[in-house]
Amino acid sequence: MADSPTLTYLLNQMYQDKEVLNGWDAVLNVLESAINQFFQAQYQAKTSGQMTIAQVFCGPRLTSPHGAYCVVTQFSFTLGPPSFVFTGSSNTVTVTQAIVSGSTRSGSMDVDAGFQPASCGCVPNDPRVTWGPVQSIDVGSNPTITAIVQLTSVTGLINPTTHTIVLDFATGAFTVNNVTLQGVTSQQLSDQIKSWFATNDMTYQVASLDFSDGSSNPALTPTQFQFNVIQTNSGNIIVQLLITTNGSPAAGIPIVLEPIPTASGYTCSLMISSRIVFSNILCAGFNAAG
């Protein structure tokens, strides 16, 4: 049954419905939970289990009877491990990290007539700034940073012909929840968080496909692919790579109700179209044997 995705159920459905890939040459299915474990391993390798983001930024030029100045804000947030939630049919992932500790302070700095905030060049505890007291972030209000990050493909991370699917935080849309910095709008704070992630090249790899022609069988060499995310009747969230090899990209999506037999202990599956199996794998094997 669909609510008990066993290997037997999957094989019976594929036998009954025949061409279940709906025109795709191959489909890789991976459980969201398995990808999450992979992401957590990457997080540990990148951060040793602790991640701190810190920014110093300047506001616009202001005037007073004593001269021109700007407001300078600095913050430091220590983040907990990320949680990742894939969004069906949109190829985006929602990433949330709790702010487990942090501090902020603000001050003023004298500026001249040509001052530009983007090039103020301030550093943490900059001696040019008249600083106010350090204030701790109220972690009792459960502050978090949330990012909506697109799944994208980049080449060359592993070798020149490898296409790697990544979460690239430089393109993310960020929201900071339950944190208020004096004189700083929520949009300004979100922009500073995004700037930190872009500057620090924070990415997570999902999977890689090698487009080289090293395979003895061209029908098994990817030429194009696209993403798909589904939630099955049993509640499993599955990330799919819909792969084109020697055929043409299909317009639809696979019609397999439960592509991963989780009740039989599986966390992923690779499906190859019957066209390739019979025409390019079995026939090639028979011809080679003959």
What residue spans do the PLM features occupy?
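Hydrophobic membrane/lipid-contacting segments
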Residues: A2-S195, T199-G290
